[in-house]
């Protein structure tokens, strides 16, 4: 059995970890970062870009860059109006009234977009470990519905991963904190404020058991909402000052989003920050275009006023979790803050104030704790971690619709999973031969105020007076928090059931088709990455050639210059149309040949005139230290021979 990785699939950033020597470690990605932006883009030529590179091009490609897809996964169209109004990409109704997105005329489900992020994380883990990865534990917000959990599993399947377990994010954070405190009896409250959700869980830790006592949260409150108050403040002020509505310009809104996110981050450590956005819009003054800019100072106190309602809203789930667990603030031993937005000083102060001045524990990294916990759970499932038992709960009650539109709970919230419950119901009218079972999730008394999960029918009931037939309903929840419901007529033995899948749930054939599609893209993605690296080398080479030519035109004859320029143009053209590995290798050879030509010209230039000051080719570090046959770390001096001055540059070789 290969390594099982732990993945924190976040709204803003994602993170992957793995167990090494019994301890969880973060996997660095190809870019050398410990987290990866959960962003997917499609370029002009249809090339798919994921992560940091997708984030870098978002301003110039706003309509085809998808972010915060976690806000839409497993949710219905009518429930997402506020979220849809904020994004710069196009949302369209999908199967079963879900939310799909359009990128470059292609319609994608949230599962597919999430799978693209998961696929990159998987590839990064394979590069890091040097072996294939096929299994994972993925975390989700504790307040994710059954449909959202199943949709996340579907995304994992599309990415080619067998999802061994879905773990609640605050529970994973507690695992990462408590792995070295297994025999310490304590109650931990985990406050997890991520990009789109807030979760609060209370756990009892002792005798190697992590038992969740209660969980509460808000699926519509996260870091994105704190960014949004700054975006609105900037857009409103600009509208008042310039009579230009930046909300109508997707590129401008994307720039506002990025600047607002950075301002929020800055204000976590600084008392004030400057938001500078030149050329954000253009106005017509006296018939001529005039560029407009934003340069404004935002103080931490201003931001806290703008976000005061959001800060206050974070306290409600804490109160609910304490109430559900029958605990007081004095009975909580540790408070863990998790999620990037938990760094906001106003949040930390509000939590500390609520707990009577008790200081939250800041020893764990808010961005990495959840992935580390997922890796520990992966180790438990893989047998590497022993004597650790995790007992999680369902966040919302599960039940069904009964006569009069009443929601009847079968399994109460905060019930430990896995679990099952059975209850007997009967018919509502005489001669009734069919019952429809409507399964819901929520806490309200009426059906209309709760989340519908699915419906199915049990037919073939023998006609009888109402109240006579006995219909046995069984609710079964697995360790992932995913529900199976079955109904059986005790009189005939006839049975029917349903596995609650994601809203707009994908069939196994659809998942398989998307998985094959993702594998096809994987090869294209690798070619695109290599092409970008090659293009960077080429641009450096061309820049060096042009600067050398500009400063030393007398060193090249027309006969020498023309073939070089032809080679440069051919390479530039070739880099625009690479489609396979063979073409890529051919371009590498052409680039290497061109590099040698330019090296030769540069060497000739130095031989002719010791005063030439332009290095002909953009040097790498290896170029500067030179080749060293004896393997020692020598210092190589590059000198300029000049009667007037001698410049010596020392470069020390470092292994």
Curated annotation (Swiss-Prot):
One example GO MF annotation: unfolded protein binding
Indicate where the modification Phosphothreonine is found in the sequence: 197
What Pfam families does its record include?
A: HSP70
Asked if the record carries the keyword Cell membrane, the reply is: no
Q: Which GO terms describe its biological process?
A: cell division
- Domain of life per record: Bacteria
* Keyword annotations: ATP-binding, Chaperone, Nucleotide-binding, Phosphoprotein, Stress response
Task: Show the HAMAP family listed in the entry.
Answer: DnaK
Similarity field: Belongs to the heat shock protein 70 family.
Q: What does this protein do?
A: Acts as a chaperone.
Q: What is this protein called?
A: Chaperone protein dnaK1
Q: Which gene encodes it?
A: dnaK1
